[in-house]
From Swiss-Prot:
Sequence repeats lie at residues 23-26, 31-34, 35-38, 39-42, 43-46, 47-50, 51-54, 59-62, 63-66, 67-70, 77-80, 86-89. Residues 19-96 are annotated as: Disordered. Residues 1-18 form the signal peptide. Keywords: Antibiotic, Antimicrobial, Fungicide, Immunity, Innate immunity, Repeat, Secreted, Signal. Antifungal heat stable protein produced in response to injury. It is active against C.albicans. No antibacterial activity against Gram-positive and Gram-negative bacteria. The keyword Ribonucleoprotein does not apply. Its main location: secreted. It is found in: Secreted. Residues 26-89 have a biased composition (Gly residues). To H.diomphalia holotricin 3. This is Tenecin-3. Residues 23-89 are annotated as: 12 X 4 AA repeats of G-X-X-G.
């Protein structure tokens, strides 16, 4: 019974977690604005304006290092505080 309860808690926790694979709004691996590996505006490997983690820690222009060949990053200002943040900050706020 104890094992069942632990499994149930894990399932609920995973279900409640933010979607880091949201496509347009970033996330850890993919997305239009971020992701560690790719994305239009961020990512550690490639991205236009992002930074080390892309859209994950902060929004449209944020990120840790400023991206490779980009102009964003920590110095430019972390525009949005949310996970996989959008243009205005927060989670899932970019719109389209």
């Amino acid at each position: 019974m104890k094992t069942f309860v632990i499994c149930l808690i894990l399932v609920v926790a995973v279900s409640a977690a933010p979607d880091h694979h949201d496509g347009h709004l970033g996330g850890h691996q993919t997305g239009h604005q971020g992701g560690q590996q790719g994305g239009h505006l961020g990512g550690q490997q490639g991205g236009h304006l992002g930074g080390h983690q892309g859209g994950q820690p902060g929004g449209h222009l944020g990120g840790h290092q400023g991206g490779i060949g980009g102009t964003g990053g920590q110095q430019h200002g972390q525009h949005g505080p949310g996970t996989g943040a959008g243009h205005q900050g927060g989670y899932k706020t970019h719109g389209h």
